[in-house]
């Protein structure tokens, strides 16, 4: 049933021009950054070749694309997640969905997986661009995989927060603004912290991605994203459960 809900949401997302416009915009930005970094690498290649231990294609070209993607997704995910529940609440179809023979958990997971599927497609496009470099150079596949995993987990966290905010209102625009504000707060929460071990650093979304961007997959960073995703999915379930009880 989760799969059926996810496929339905996937079709609805792609039925609107927004998903296509967003994907086209993402690919345009990613391609521009990719080609810009590739041009920089080609200009620096003589110096790189003469320097032992110099950074390679992955560090100079691929990693910056993933870094740029974090900022772009911060702005884009609120637009994709805003209608997941808010639109159904506004059009008054949410009571019909909740009265169907499916659990609230299945509804929430289905909607989340549909959005995550689109974000995974965006991450896959970046990976495909970076893999094209293997035709003319050598890539650090471990570093590439760590960046891709980190970006996917970060995008999943964005999606979970966006889904929860969409559960709170009947206005998609309000959900989008609220999601962006919440994500930005979690992004910048450590800006005033001086101690790397402080709670503000631990709670920062981008702080954990930086570990992945260096090629390290640490259990604490995996755990952070998975716990954050699970927390906001649980909050979404609790919110819709409360709505079902009131209905």
Question: What is each of the regions a protein language model found here?
Answer:
Residues 146-171, 228-233:
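Hydrophobic alpha-helical transmembrane segments of polytopic membrane proteins
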Residues 17-41, 68-76, 181-185:
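Hydrophobic alpha-helical transmembrane segments of multi-pass membrane transport/permease proteins
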Residues 84-114:
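Helix-loop-helix units of permease transmembrane domains in multi-pass membrane transporters
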Residues 17, 73, 77, 102-132, ...:
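Selective transmembrane-helix segments that form parts of the transport pathway or gating/packing helices
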Residues 128-151, 211:
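Membrane-interfacial helix-loop-helix connectors in multipass membrane proteins
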Residues 36-60, 178-247:
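Terminal transmembrane helical anchor/hairpin motif
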Residues 61-87:
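Long, hydrophobic alpha-helical segments
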Residues 1-23:
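Aromatic- and glycine-rich beta-strand/loop motifs that create alpha-glucan
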């Amino acid at each position: 049933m989760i799969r059926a809900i996810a496929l339905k949401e996937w079709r609805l997302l792609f039925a609107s021009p927004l998903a296509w416009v967003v994907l086209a915009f993402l690919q345009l930005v990613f391609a521009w950054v990719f080609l810009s970094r590739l041009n920089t690498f080609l200009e620096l290649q003589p110096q790189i070749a003469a320097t032992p231990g110099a950074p390679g294609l992955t560090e100079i070209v691929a990693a910056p694309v993933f870094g740029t993607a974090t900022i772009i997704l911060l702005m884009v995910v609120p637009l994709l997640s805003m209608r997941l529940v808010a639109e159904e609440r506004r059009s008054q179809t949410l009571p019909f969905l909740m009265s169907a023979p499916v659990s609230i958990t299945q509804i929430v997971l289905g909607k989340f997986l549909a959005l995550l599927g689109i974000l995974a497609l965006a991450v896959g496009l970046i990976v495909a661009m970076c893999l094209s470099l293997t035709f003319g150079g050598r890539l650090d596949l471990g570093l590439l995989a760590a960046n891709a995993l980190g970006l996917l987990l970060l995008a999943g966290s964005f999606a979970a927060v966006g889904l929860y905010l969409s559960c709170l209102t009947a206005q998609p625009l309000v959900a989008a603004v609220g999601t962006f504000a919440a994500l930005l707060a979690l992004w910048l929460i450590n800006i005033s912290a001086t101690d790397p071990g402080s709670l503000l650093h631990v709670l920062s979304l981008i702080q954990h991605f930086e570990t992945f961007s260096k090629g390290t997959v640490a259990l604490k960073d995996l755990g952070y994203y998975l716990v954050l995703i699970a927390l906001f999915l649980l909050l979404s379930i609790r919110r819709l459960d409360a709505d079902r009880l009131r209905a």
